């Protein structure tokens, strides 16, 4: 009996160790693409330009919250959303998605967490209350945020979000979130 329990315990612990190591290696892989492949997009002159323009619009938190309420209530695509999805910034993001096989969406946020531009309509306009913006904007310091891998019913596969700062002159002025197909990351 004791021998059976010991064998079971060793098997369970060994499996947990292997799974833990594999998960750690995957997280390292995601962190590596965040830093080496995705973070440089946060320095792109067009992304910086559009983010600075949005930051200089003078939008208050009340303005952002009103837009967020309106945005969330909208079932489809409204005319007021089109500049975020059809402008030059969004077109640039779509080009990036088309060139990187593991990406399925990108959206850029300003220094308050409001949408600057995006490839697909987000569920809300205000992202500033979410970890992806908070950790990547990091009070203007900039950081990398790799979210947990989750199964997406719509895609039928595992996905995750990776967020990096939009940087200008050594300071975070916004953030970018990338939707990533977990199984396509090499």
Task: Annotate each PLM feature.
Residues 70, 114-119:
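Amphipathic coiled-coil signal-relay and dimerization helices
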Residues 23-78, 102, 184:
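Juxtamembrane extracytoplasmic/periplasmic/luminal helical "stalk" adjacent to the first N-terminal
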Residues 157-186:
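Conserved beta-strands of PAS-like sensory domains
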Residues 9-18:
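Bacterial N-terminal signal peptides
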Residues 1-9:
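Bacterial N-terminal signal peptides that target proteins for export
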């Amino acid at each position: 009996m004791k021998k059976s329990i010991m064998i079971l315990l060793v098997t369970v612990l060994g499996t947990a160790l292997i799974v833990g190591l594999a998960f750690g290696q995957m997280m390292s892989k995601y962190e590596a693409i965040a830093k080496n492949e995705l973070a440089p997009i946060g320095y792109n002159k067009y992304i910086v330009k559009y983010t600075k323009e949005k930051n200089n619009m003078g939008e208050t938190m009340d303005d952002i919250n009103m837009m967020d309420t309106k945005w969330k209530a909208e079932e489809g695509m409204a005319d007021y959303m089109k500049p975020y999805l059809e402008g030059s910034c969004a077109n640039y993001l779509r080009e990036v998605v088309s060139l990187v096989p593991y990406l399925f969406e990108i959206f850029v946020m300003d220094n308050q967490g409001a949408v600057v531009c995006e490839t697909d309509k987000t569920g809300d306009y205000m992202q500033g209350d979410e970890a992806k913006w908070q950790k990547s904007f990091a009070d203007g310091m900039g950081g990398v945020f790799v979210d947990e891998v989750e199964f997406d019913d719509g895609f039928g596969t595992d996905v995750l979000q990776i967020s990096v700062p939009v940087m200008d002159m050594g300071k975070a002025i916004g953030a970018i979130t990338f939707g990533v197909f977990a199984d396509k990351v090499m």
